[in-house]
Amino acid sequence: MRRVVGKRVQEFSDAEFEQLRSQYDDVVLDVGTGDGKHPYKVARQNPSRLVVALDADKSRMEKISAKAAAKPAKGGLPNLLYLWATAERLPPLSGVGELHVLMPWGSLLRGVLGSSPEMLRGMAAVCRPGASFLVALNLHAWRPSVPEVGEHPEPTPDSADEWLAPRYAEAGWKLADCRYLEPEEVAGLETSWTRRLHSSRDRFDVLALTGTISP
């Protein structure tokens, strides 16, 4: 594993991860974390849970990862780990009890729309049976459509149940609920994408998909 600590990238062995994981009640994984502010909030609010955040662009995690690695008096969080990795090639994690994919873009967006069953199965493989998931989709990716959405129409709660749920099920994901988030819920995600996009629009629509994973 490649751990990001500020501008440095450190090797983090499987044994080191298992030793760290053993100190906490559960593991939360945030895939495509961007600047990493969402997992920082989760880790701060849940000191008994290990939070792992990863992104393909290590530079975006530099600032927050340095803060997380500092002493607790300076904002450090010992239960937070930032990794440089892609959703296509996840590090050898295990025991994840909660999976977050918020405002995905690029190949990650294509994957959670069902275009890459391998990606969905890969994320399921690092989860324990019964793990929960939250996928939050920025619907403005369809207004107008960006190349990543391909031929997928803008999802709605009804259409997600119709065409996305079966694709998820094939990969071990059981879609239980699909709904639009209220403005305060969007703000509560604590991501730079939500703040940036919301500030440029009178209305910012996010569709949340939740359920469980049984790899």
From Swiss-Prot:
Q: Which UniProt keywords apply?
A: Antibiotic resistance, Methyltransferase, S-adenosyl-L-methionine, Transferase
Enzyme category, top tier: transferase
Q: Which GO terms fall under molecular function for this chain's record?
A: methyltransferase activity
Q: Report the superkingdom from the record.
A: Bacteria
Q: Name one GO biological process term.
A: response to antibiotic
User: Which residues pair up as cystines?
Assistant: none
Q: According to its UniProt entry, what is the function of this protein?
A: Specifically methylates the N(1) position of adenine 1408 in 16S rRNA. Confers resistance to various aminoglycosides, including kanamycin, neomycin and apramycin.
What the record says about family reads: Belongs to the methyltransferase superfamily. Kanamycin-apramycin resistance family.
Protein's recorded name: 16S rRNA (adenine(1408)-N(1))-methyltransferase
